[in-house]
């Protein structure tokens, strides 16, 4: 499932960034299965922060209804020197526009799109107009 893969990818980035002293923050439309609140984790670094992030990600209810991610992105404001990484299999024009505005279309913005092997060409064509660096992660080609 692409949602579960997105969570796994997020976990890997959190661990990698924090191990290099880079603070991370999570903005998600995923809902905590216990609190029923959207998952949002303030910026931080260190082992306790990683543990808090992983705990929240593990409690994400992947079957619950969620708000559109572009709404959540629009509510946040990125700073001009902030590196942004969007991990989402959703590829809508509305999300692309919201992310471009949030990331201010800088070279510091990247969109990782988990997809299945047969969907790559169509995904690349669909999002070819997006000026943000977009990388497609083919699930069948990733090491587990």
Where are these regions (language model features)?
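Exposed, interaction-prone extracellular/peripheral surfaces
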Residues: 1-144
């Amino acid at each position: 499932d692409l949602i579960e893969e997105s969570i796994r990818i997020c976990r890997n980035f959190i661990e990698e960034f924090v191990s290099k002293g880079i603070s991370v923050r999570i903005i998600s439309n995923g809902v905590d299965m216990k609190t029923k609140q959207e998952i949002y984790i303030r910026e931080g670094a260190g082992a306790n922060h990683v543990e808090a992030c992983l705990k929240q990600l593990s409690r994400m209810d992947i079957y619950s209804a969620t708000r559109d991610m572009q709404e959540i992105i629009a509510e946040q404001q990125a700073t001009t020197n902030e590196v942004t990484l969007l991990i989402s299999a959703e590829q809508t024009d509305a999300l692309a526009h919201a992310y471009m505005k949030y990331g201010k279309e800088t070279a510091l913005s990247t969109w990782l799109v988990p997809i299945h092997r047969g969907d790559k060409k169509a995904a690349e064509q669909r999002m070819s107009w997006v000026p943000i660096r977009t990388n497609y992660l083919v699930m069948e080609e990733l090491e587990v």
